Amino acid sequence: MEAKEGVNHSKRQRRYGARDKEEIIKSVIKLHDQGYSQVDISKMLGIARNTIKRWNDELHFFEARTPGEAGKLKNKIYRYNEDYFENILTPNQAYVVGYITGDGTVFDRKKSKRLVLVLAEQDKQLLQDISEELNIEDAIKFRKRNASNEQNKYSLTINSTKMCNDLIMLGVGPKKTGFEKWIDFENEELQWAYLRGFFDADGHIRVYERNGYQKARIGFTGNSKMLKEILVFLKSKGFAVNVNCITQKQGCCDLYLSSIKEIKLLGKELYKHGTIKLNRKYEKFSSLMI
């Protein structure tokens, strides 16, 4: 009985004519000189990254970059200010630092660092406002959910070792979850804006009715040390006078304020300085002012 011939399942490589290849290489060189990575170039030109690498290995039309060099050039593409976190002088700067303290991630890849912010689709507005403040609106990317119990998300990635190092100097470093630190700017306007940023990242507000009366509760979530510092700050400004404890729960702690009169006054201070805010939470505060 004759043996059946095996089927060749290997993928065929796409063949490019000499002229096509020449034009593609010209485009690759141009985009590479503009600072785009090989991954970006392959997506933009619709050509496999391995093909670009193979051609470059043969013809040496550009020199591959290190991760750090690639990050710096990507910074130039988006034209953001790498010194943004070097000196915190405005409420919006303090807000962004506060938000990153609560919900940002600094990745240290030894040769380079990057900052990543990820928000749920419903809060895309805040990511747009932060990216506008940093002058990198085009860097926002959509992340489609992978499962039915997940949400669609938007992300903002900043490839800048300088900006990450400045954040680390402020006290916002890699692997900070559970070890967030309160940053004292020694300036009341900056401190309130910073607290608002942290609240938008790791805080919550509930407005409800009970027995015909309007009620509210505001909370901050974090590690014990961070929340104690927040409590000290609030008490120094005349708030949380009757709050003397922090609620322990699995993996973190909560700090609650439940006096509606106090929460109304707190809202006025939180939103007094700077323009960046999470509209969803601001609208809940605003409902108390009616």
Predicted regions and their residues:
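Internal intein/HINT superfamily modules and their associated LAGLIDADG
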Residues: 2-290
